[in-house]
Amino acid sequence: MQAEELYVALNSSEATEAGLDLMFNGDSNGSGGFADASLNGTSKIIGSKTAASTLAGSATTKAKFDNMIIDFATNVVPNWGSDAGVGQAGAISSPDGASTYHINAQGQEIDQLFFKGLIGAFTLDQIVNNYIHPNQLDSGSRIDDNDNDVLSGDNNYTDMEHKWDEGFGYLLSLIHI
C-alpha cells in the first residue's frame, strides 16, 4: 500500500525530498517512487486526495504536507546521526533507551504529524466532503434509484450504496496504517 511505503520512507535516513514528493504527489505518469512496482503508474495518488475538497483552507492544508516533506528531507535527514537539542534537529531516545525518534528543530516527529494529519486531511475529507456529502448522495436520481433498488450498471449495488462503501473503505483503510 502506498501509505505504508511512504511511512517507511518518512522513517529513513536515505529519504530525499524528490523521492518523498514523488511518493506523495506523483508525476505526469501518475503515482511513483514505490518499491512495489504495482503501486507505480496509477491514478491513485495520496497527495491528490489530501485536502482535495473545495472547502476554504484546502490549499493551505495541502501545502502543510508538502512543507513537512521539505522539512524532513532538508532538516531531519541531514541530522539523523546527531543528538537533538533545543532548536536542533536530530535523534532523541525514549527514557528507557529502547526507542529513538528523529525530530526537527521544533521537536516534532514529522512522520507522526504527517500521518496523523492524513487522518483528517485525507481520510475525513474524502469521506465527509466527497463520498457521503449530500452533493454526492442526493445528486441526480440517486435517492429514487436507491429507494427503488436500481442497480448501478452491471453491479449488484446502487450508486448511493457504492458512495457509502467507498467512504467506509477510506475509514477502514486506517486499520492497515
What are these regions (language model features)?
Residues M1-I175:
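Mature extracytoplasmic or organellar-lumen-exposed domains after removal of signal/transit peptides
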